[in-house]
């Protein structure tokens, strides 16, 4: 029999906030790379991938998982959890590199969006498979398909915005839209999942030393700190470049 599940709405709110800030930071970094006379830097590609893939997508996903409450003990496989994080960062990094390393044609955009979106969807379902509990997951294939479509569309739009946006206000608005899309994909994927008790299965508990609320707050704060560092570094680079450009006439 399928179990009733509920959500901790405070953690749901945190998952949305981190997705907005991660999206904004990633857009800032990518926009700075696109306008840089030095061209694409792999270090900044990594920083953007860390912000978007690690912050806006994976951290949102994991806090959203912690917000999901079922009447049984739930642990997380460290190996699969780390794999899902790695997939998110690497896939988004590849997508960003494709987007900023040359003229973003329709073919390049759609190809990068498809690859990144499918990888993000894979990250989500691998992350869900990392849940360790005395139960089995059952899926609604229609909702799974919808979540994958949302992931591909969201990734494609995100890559286009990352390359074409100018101005902090537009970036903030776009970051909110991106966060809505990322959360939409995640919670559609969660809605596709049902949970049933499996009394016959061999279950090895993975103890969590922290409650879901404590763990969610810890991950939120750690991710925010990392994103703030990335954003400050990006803004510092942008200000230094502007100072250099303003100083150029003095040398003519």
Locate the predicted segments by residue.
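Peripheral, non-catalytic segments of secretory and membrane proteins
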Residues: 1-252
């Amino acid at each position: 029999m399928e179990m009733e599940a509920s959500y901790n709405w405070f953690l749901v709110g945190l998952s949305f906030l981190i997705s907005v800030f991660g999206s904004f930071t990633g857009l800032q970094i990518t926009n700075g790379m696109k306008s840089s006379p030095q061209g694409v830097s792999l270090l900044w590609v990594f920083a953007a991938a860390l912000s978007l893939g690690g912050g806006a997508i994976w951290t949102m996903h994991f806090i959203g998982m912690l917000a999901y409450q079922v009447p049984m003990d739930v642990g997380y496989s460290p190996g699969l959890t780390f794999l899902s994080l790695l997939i998110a960062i690497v896939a988004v990094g590849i997508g960003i590199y494709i987007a900023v390393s040359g003229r973003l044609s329709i073919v390049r955009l759609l190809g990068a969006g498809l690859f990144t979106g499918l990888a993000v969807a894979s990250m989500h379902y691998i992350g869900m498979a990392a849940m360790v509990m005395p139960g089995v997951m059952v899926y609604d294939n229609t909702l799974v398909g919808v979540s994958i479509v949302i992931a591909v569309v969201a990734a494609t739009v995100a890559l286009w915005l990352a390359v074409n946006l100018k101005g902090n206000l537009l970036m903030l608005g776009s970051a909110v839209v991106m966060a809505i899309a990322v959360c939409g994909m995640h919670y559609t994927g969660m809605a596709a999942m049902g949970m049933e008790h499996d009394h016959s299965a061999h279950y090895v508990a993975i103890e969590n030393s922290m409650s879901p609320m404590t763990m969610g707050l810890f991950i939120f704060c750690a991710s925010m700190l990392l994103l703030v560092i990335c954003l400050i570094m990006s803004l510092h680079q942008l200000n230094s470049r502007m100072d250099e450009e303003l100083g150029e006439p003095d040398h003519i």
